Swiss-Prot record:
Name the UniProt record assigns to this protein: Monocarboxylate transporter 3
Compositionally biased spans, kind Basic and acidic residues: 204-214, 493-504
Function: Probable retinal pigment epithelium (RPE)-specific proton-coupled L-lactate transporter. May facilitate transport of lactate and H(+) out of the retina and could therefore play a role in pH and ion homeostasis of the outer retina.
Compositionally biased spans, kind Low complexity: 215-224
Pfam family name, one: MFS_1
Native organism: Homo sapiens
Region described as Disordered: spans on this chain: 196-224, 441-504
């Protein structure tokens, strides 16, 4: 019997080994989101040793974040081809090697290639597979699981920032990078526990063709994506798409992608600039580094609390609007705190920012999972991360350039806050429009775009189609179905009989 993933027709276990997977996802998320921000405590030393401006130095974090997001489609393809566990093990080695090599860098370009490209790629190859595996283990408790996993970011941020400051003071930035590279090897341990969820044997209707459980000679599996297709006839061979670009035609996905682009332009800027902003305001180095810890401490509480709140039956259908509210609150926090200069005002900003930032972090992937469904989530996540990469390459470096030119942080906070607030308003308005259009338009049979699985298989050649997702009441609109059912929709289960029928 293959171990590629859960058997069709069986829902996620919502527990068991899933809690171990959740713990690993917690660690990976912490490294992925906390590491690029924590590296900012080394910027002053890098600026001095390389005689560079802040904008040039900030490219290290920006490239790291861009690789984390921009290689999303690559990660999706690798997960579909090789599975979650091998990809995460390779990613952990790459992330560690990048920081170790960066400790020997003599030019900024070498830092860009090592700490930026290699470490960013390694983090990406850990982050996306961990989210995919988390979705395989949790369905009913998925909002809570997402919130708990997302709490890894503030926990690690609150720990890595002071740790980086201590390493910088004791060993210099080179010794600090070397030790942080060793710390990233924990990603390999996280990848090792990412085994596919167990499942029962195939459904009885598939046994009627004469194949016994686990003995089908044409069994094809996708280890990490949790997809398992069995050939019922050697003459018809279903093929799997390594990256499902058809998700781009989905209204819900388009709304989410635009929202994430606007959000990423400004969301990370305050956190990246915060330490140096405080230092320029006369705050001691240790106290300035502790500001990120304050953000992290508040974020730790906000993420699981918001995840549990979003899992309530009455609120879960309205998760997109909660996400919009979180974005709006984050943007308004930046706008109202642009003139903060005293340490007390900066602490108040960190508390408000950590609360809204935690809400965004807890809800962002839950909204995407609910919008596109589990079967298309790997491809959708990869494409969304690619969109975010473009915004990350624009936002923080542009902010750093403005700081160098204007010597003023105030306009940076105004710009960042406006972008994030605009993302929240757009998400709410566009979601409402999609829901209204879906209610007004008659529902048609089949999926949009029209081609059948067998036609796709013949056209793709070397790719194998993902399982068909039955047409729901419009993806984002399908969230409203939750209010009547009290639990999430499972479009992939509805589509399974069709897949079995077409393969005969």
């Amino acid at each position: 019997m293959g171990a590629g993933g859960p058997r069709r027709g069986e829902g996620p276990p919502d527990g068991g080994w899933g809690w171990v997977v959740l713990g690993a996802c917690f660690v990976v998320t912490g490294f992925a989101y906390g590491f690029p921000k924590a590296v900012s405590v080394f910027f002053r030393a890098l600026m001095r040793d390389f005689d560079a401006g802040y904008s040039d130095t900030a490219w290290v974090s920006s490239i790291m974040l861009a690789m984390l997001y921009g290689t999303g489609p690559v990660s999706s393809i690798l997960v579909t081809r090789f599975g979650c566990r091998p990809v995460m093990l390779a990613g952990g080695l790459l992330a560690s090697a990048g920081m170790i090599l960066a400790s020997f860098a003599t030019r900024l370009l070498e830092l860009y290639l090592t700490a930026g490209v290699l470490t960013g790629l390694g983090l990406a190859l850990n982050f996306q597979p961990s989210l995919i595996m988390l979705g395989l283990y949790f369905e009913r408790r998925r909002p809570l699981a997402n919130g708990l996993a997302a709490a890894g970011s503030p926990v690690f941020l609150s720990a890595l920032s002071p740790l980086g400051q201590q390493l910088l003071e004791r060993f210099g930035w080179r010794g600090g990078f070397l030790l942080l590279g060793g710390l990233l090897l924990h990603c390999c341990a996280c990848g090792a526990v990412m085994r596919p969820p167990p499942g029962p044997g195939p459904r009885p209707r598939r046994d009627s063709a004469g194949d016994r459980a686990g003995d089908a000679p044409g069994e094809a599996e996708a280890d990490g994506a949790g997809l398992q297709l069995r050939e019922a006839s050697p003459r018809v061979r279903p093929r799997r798409r390594l990256l499902d670009l058809a998700v781009c035609t989905d209204r819900a996905f388009a709304v989410y992608a635009v929202t994430k682009f606007l959000m990423a332009l400004g969301l990370f800027v305050p956190a990246i600039l915060l330490v140096n902003y405080a230092k320029d305001a006369g705050v001691p180095d240790t106290d300035a580094a502790f500001l990120l810890s304050i953000v992290g401490f508040v974020d730790i509480v906000a993420r699981p609390a918001c995840g549990a709140l979003a899992g309530l039956a009455r609120l879960r259908p309205h998760v997109p609007y909660l996400f919009s509210l979180a974005l709006l609150a984050n943007g308004l926090t930046d706008l109202s705190s642009a003139r903060a200069r005293s340490y007390g005002a900066l602490v108040a900003f960190c508390v408000a920012f950590g609360l809204s930032y935690g809400m965004v972090g807890a809800l962002q992937f839950e909204v995407l999972m609910a919008a596109v469904g589990a079967p298309r989530f790997p491809s959708a996540l990869g494409l969304v991360l690619l969109v975010e990469a473009a915004a990350v390459l624009i936002g923080p470096p542009s902010a750093g350039r403005l700081v160098d030119v204007l010597k003023n942080y105030e306009i940076i906070f105004y710009l960042a806050g406006s972008e994030v607030a605009l993302a929240g308003v757009f998400m709410a308005v566009a979601t409402n429009c999609c829901l209204r259009c879906a209610k007004a338009a008659p529902s048609g049979p089949g999926t949009e775009g029209g081609a059948s699985d067998t036609e796709d298989a013949e056209a793709e050649g070397d790719s194998e189609p993902l399982p068909v997702v039955a047409e729901e009441p419009g993806n984002l609109e399908a969230l409203e179905v939750l209010s009547a059912r009290g639990e999430p929709t499972e479009p992939e289960i509805e589509a399974r009989p069709r897949l079995a029928a077409e393969s005969v």
